[in-house]
């Protein structure tokens, strides 16, 4: 069974990570988790500035971490993780009960 990468299913998987897993929000904490090698997946919003995005990609490449480009902007990513503010980057440290790491491979 191939994973369906629709926006709705990704939002559901993100919600499950928020409930049962460990994650960090934001650029600085994501860079920190990438440098420490704790991050398993980073999710970048579509409207993240190019310089910031390239820096995240560089650190992800060094730590061999998967990168997923979220289709919506930072408003939608914030809503997907259940926050009432904008979120540019989400770093998944532990997926918990979610299969987001295998689905977004």
Swiss-Prot record:
A molecular function GO annotation: pre-mRNA 5'-splice site binding
Keywords carried by this UniProt record: Ribonucleoprotein, Ribosomal protein
Coiled-coil regions listed: none
Alphabetical GO biological process terms: negative regulation of mRNA splicing, via spliceosome; rRNA processing
Pfam families: Ribosomal_L7Ae (PF01248)
Keyword Ribosomal protein attributed: yes
Cellular-component GO terms for this entry: cytosolic large ribosomal subunit; extracellular region; fungal biofilm matrix
InterPro entries to which the protein is assigned, alphabetical: Ribosomal_eL30-like (IPR039109), Ribosomal_eL30-like_sf (IPR029064), Ribosomal_eL30_CS (IPR022991), Ribosomal_eL8/eL30/eS12/Gad45 (IPR004038)
Family: Belongs to the eukaryotic ribosomal protein eL30 family.
PANTHER family xref list: RIBOSOMAL PROTEIN L30
Name of the protein this chain belongs to: Large ribosomal subunit protein eL30
């Amino acid at each position: 069974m191939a994973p369906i990468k629709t926006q709705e299913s990704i939002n559901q998987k993100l919600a499950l990570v928020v409930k049962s897993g460990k994650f960090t929000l934001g650029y600085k904490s994501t860079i920190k988790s990438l440098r420490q090698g704790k991050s398993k997946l980073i999710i970048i919003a579509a409207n993240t500035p190019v310089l910031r995005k390239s820096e995240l990609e560089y650190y992800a490449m060094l730590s061999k971490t998967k990168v997923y480009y979220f289709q919506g902007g930072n408003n939608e990513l914030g809503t997907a993780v259940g926050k009432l503010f904008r979120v540019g980057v989400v770093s998944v440290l532990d997926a918990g009960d979610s299969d987001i790491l295998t689905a977004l491979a």
